[in-house]
Amino acid sequence: MLQAQKQSDPILPWGASWAGRGQTLRARSTDSLDGPGEGSVQPVPTTGGPGTKGKPGKRLSAPRGPFPRLADCAHFHYENVDFGHIQLLLSPEREGPSLSGENELVFGVQVTCQGRSWPVLRSYDDFRSLDAHLHRCIFDRRFSCLPELPPPPEGTRAAQMLVPLLLQYLETLSGLVDSNLNCGPVLTWMELDNHGRRLLLSEEASLNIPAVAAAHVVKRYTAQAPDELSFEVGDIVSVIDMPPTEDRSWWRGKRGFQVGFFPSECVELFTERPGPGLKADADSPLCGIPAPQGISSLTSAVPRPRGKLAGLLRTFMRSRPSRQRLRQRGILRQRVFGCDLGEHLSNSGQDVPQVLRCCSEFIEAHGVVDGIYRLSGVSSNIQRLRHEFDSERIPELSGPAFLQDIHSVSSLCKLYFRELPNPLLTYQLYGKFSEAMSVPGEEERLVRVHDVIQQLPPPHYRTLEYLLRHLARMARHSANTSMHARNLAIVWAPNLLRSMELESVGLGGAAAFREVRVQSVVVEFLLTHVEVLFSDTFTSAGLDPAGRCLLPRPKSLAGSSPSTRLLTLEEAQARTQGRLGTPTEPTTPKTPASPVERRKRERAEKQRKPGGSSWKTFFALGRGPSIPRKKPLPWLGGSRAPPQPSGSRPDTVTLRSAKSEESLSSQASGAGLQRLHRLRRPHSSSDAFPVGPAPAGSCESLSSSSSSSSSSSSSSSSESSAGGLGPLSGSPSHRTSAWLDDGDDLDFSPPRCLEGLRGLDFDPLTFRCSSPTPGDPAPPASPAPPASASAFPPRATPQALSPHGPTKPASPTALDISEPLAVSVPPAVLELLGAGGTPASATPTPALSPHLIPLLLRGAEAQLSDTCQQEISSKLAPTRGAPGQQSPGGMDSPLLPPPLPLLRPGGAPPPPPKNPARLMALALAERAQQVAEQQSQQEQGGTPPAPHSPFRRSLSLEVGGEPVGTSGSGIHPPSLAHPGAWAPGPPPYLPRQQSDGSLVRSQRPLGTSRRSPRGPSQVSAHLRASGAYRDAPEMAAQSPCSVPSQGSNPSFFSTPRECLPPFLGVPKQGLYSLGPPSFPPSSPAPVWRNSLGAPSALDRGENLYYEIGVGEGTSYSGPSRSWSPFRSMPPDRHNASYGMLGQSPPLHRSPDFLLSYPPPPSCFPPEHLTHSVSQRLARRPTRPEPLYVNLALGPRGPSPASSSSSSPPAHPRSRSDPGPPVPRLPQKQRAPWGPHTPHRVPGPWGSPEPFLLYRPAPPSYGRGGEVRGSLYRNGGHRGEGAGPPPPYPTPSWSLHSEGQTRSYC
């Protein structure tokens, strides 16, 4: 019922009349643009129907009332605006532009602000006027990127041409509009005021209809339709429409800024009747309103003042136009001081304020005085000048009054900018200027500040440029004015840059001081770089908002000279993978560094330059200096590369760690080679020469292998690069210098038993594992080793070791450690090395105690992180082979990559020595060897034999091949371990030396080569190539660890006997003789069983012994040995801490097991140790005694099965955490022979104590005295109660010889 009444005949507002269509609507406006009680306005013809409820019937752009058009409106700016974001779209309610009565195209625009939307109608000329106002007062076209609207086209298709243009224009403008719009004409175009409310015209808005009565709410009502009002009890409502007395159901009224209908019974009117003698005002809105029935009138009325004057004043105050109306009509002119800068420049038609122009010209001509802009002038002169400018008159500044008071002119200039309603740098950009100044880097800060300046309104931009150029010119006279750029910035900053938030809360103290600091820094930066910031050539195009380059810049070295710079490992991998067509992981393109960043990186590289050399340079002493060829790669901390998924890397690529671009061209010859993954060495640290240990990380991300370009200098380069014999087979003359020719071509890999080691302290001498046979299927790389993986690798097939290379590639399973690390060498070390390395020394050098060797071996070790350790374990752990392929022992066999060429003749010498700790250790080891030789010569009374080759080092556990003519030449002096009775413990800073097995040395006949693999599948290249497997296939089937070797005379071994573990018996001092062999060489190896229970866990590690020997040839001088090589044992003070080896009884050609750490308990009588010196002299050839250096490996992590959850202690050599004291180092002993075996070790993890030993495996018998073997655990054979194999390969021993250099593991 009520709804039907509400939609009935239209209810005309009181005070309006109409006589059908074409009549006029009269209303009084109460908008803020009109004065209170302003008189009637001009009528506006309505074009809508009778039910329009006050909606506009004519387009809003050209009202025929007091509200002017935009072109006719005086320009003004609001002082404060706060409306937020504004969205502008072409109105979807209209099908398109329509033609008005004046044949103009009219477009509907939907304006959305603060969650409210309304449509406005604008012509194309209005759009062009809006564009002109925007770019005159608000935006610069370089910042807004808005196109200038062209003149309206002519023709019938003009509308279709303009619609896409206006759509794009409004979309771009909506992204720019924020609370930075303070231009009155622009906001009026959108029908907005400065607070985001809709600004309605008086002729069209029902809100502007005057009220006929006031009422208060007595009953709450909730709106049921969009055109209804909701109110609560007690609210005040202005009633604008009241129906006749007989129909009082629905009234219309205003509550706040809302207009709508409401039930009449919900409100009560406030009635007011004039007194009987009071004449009602004709203009009163209550005049002629019949009093509703039921409403009682007031009993008495308040009398009004009488007289003409009061009436006139009252009429004037009601009809007085508002300030805004006067400014719009141009009647009220804004003063200069305190006027918005854009409004003042728009009204005056000038580019910069007249105040700034006059003051700056006067000060530059007459104001070069001390303290300009810092000292204040006379206040009366300042006020007089201000009044002159406000009156739009230009004062005469050249008068004597102002010439005598120049500071008043400078104070006036500062006062003008201080009184701007919006500062010169604007409130809106205060935060952006602060953020731009907080970025690091001068160039990036310059770009960011330049971008913020471009966001200034054009009047502010022009004024700022003029002012800053003036201040920069004044700063050049700082010698006369004492006002340089910083002082000028301090006095000008509060006038140019202010924060509205900080001003509103009125901060003081420290907060105000910080604001002043920010202001002064910004203004000083602008003053310093004014020529660049306001230059027409400077642009930030192609840069992101942070100032970083989006467009790649051309590099000067890219493709111009490939050999002029080094490539990192990542770049080399990316280029090689791209050349082979292998998909790589998507990476974010690196943006070119700015000049400032390049300078910082160059300075950082200069600081790291002392560590850019290699430890191999020790062997190039005396060969002349060379240019360092490698730079230290970043070690994995914050830039750790993610692990690669299985199959994502090519299997047929060989890479070097860091090579020039020129060397990558040689990769094509090795396309069929297996790429070995390398485990890089950690950085070293020394107390004397500190080098910060770098964090460890992924080995997969830095895996690399030796370059396949190290082919033979003979004809067949491709064949020799695939095999192991190629590099040296045809050129024996290069053998001596091949060690020093090209250190980067040396391919070293760690033994498989070194998986997961925390401290890889077998540097500077590195090791290399053999590679898998191509015939065996390659197991897929898995992140974790399977539990049932075998610990015994399979045997390699002979065809895999052919010089022609493998038939097909295999997956890499072994890692290679070859990345050198180095530091600078002080002059004292160089002098020491030079004295030790001179063949003929003028003055005798004192013999240094070999005790210094282990003290200097602590200088190159860094901790690997847990993540890296786990990854190394997963890479080194054996994986299950293909089904059906079992090792002789019945276990699955992991595969290793084939060997790569070891040396390449020719090439530049390695870089000069730069690692003091390693060089010192090698130098002292050499000196100790020389001492031993001299002492041996003095006791024997003979002349020392000339060394066959210069001082050389042990390279690898598995060297690829031996040159022709050198494998069997010369007499190789054997040696035997002779531990002393006293075994001093290591100092606290020495790492704990641990051992998983014995190190074996063998005596062999003259002319035989001593090469021995570490396991069944790790066979040296020259053995495989020589057809060793074809010679004795039946011997290989007898024992899982027996591999035929090259030679004719087999060696005889004695069966080792079992001894008690360390915690069940007291170790006995002394050495024990070796018994006769318990089985013939042709008999199969016996099965050794363990009779003891499970011991506690122990830390796995391995001691690597390096023999630094001297053969026949030229003399090799050095300090004399401090003990006789024919004594039963060296002095106690020289034993057990550095692994000194002595003589071996030659009755049988059997190896000695040197148990480096820990020693086994003694279980043999001392008479077994009786070996007279005369017997040894009779059986011992007069050869110099080799010297062995024991380099220990760091401890492993905690055991998974252990209940202890604490992490392992830091490495003893770590400078950050020295860790707890390490137990004393036991003496080195020989494993006694007997039917018993030491106790098995349950797993690779565990506490450091107690230390258990592995028992020796059945040794293999080969020809030529070559020995190999493996250390079994718990019997070594499955199916005999030994349990499942361990998740890591069992340690194996091997004997390796390269001329006069031998390695044992």
Swiss-Prot record:
| Region (Disordered) location | 1-64, 575-818, 864-1054, 1115-1305
- Site label Arginine finger, positions: 374
**Compositional bias ranges of the Basic and acidic residues kind:** 596-608
Q: Which residues carry this modification: Omega-N-methylarginine?
A: 1263
Instruction: Give every SH3 domain span.
Output: 210-272
Location comes to: Cell membrane
Q: Which SMART domains match?
A: RhoGAP (SM00324), SH3 (SM00326)
A Pfam family found in this protein is RhoGAP
Q: Tell me where in this chain the PTM Phosphotyrosine is found.
A: 1188
Please tell me whether the keyword Transport is annotated for this protein: yes
Family under the similarity heading? Belongs to the PX domain-containing GAP family.
PANTHER family per the UniProt record, alphabetical: CDC42 GTPASE-ACTIVATING PROTEIN (PTHR15729), RHO GTPASE-ACTIVATING PROTEIN 33 (PTHR15729:SF11)
Please tell me in which tissues this protein is expressed.
Highly expressed in brain and testis. Also expressed in white adipose tissue (WAT) and muscle at a low level.
Q: Which organism is it from?
A: Mus musculus
UniProt biased composition (Low complexity): 582-595, 694-733, 787-798, 916-940, 1194-1208
Oligomeric and partner information: Specifically interacts with CDC42 and RHOQ/TC10 through its Rho-GAP domain. Interacts with NEK6.
Name of the molecule in the record: Rho GTPase-activating protein 33
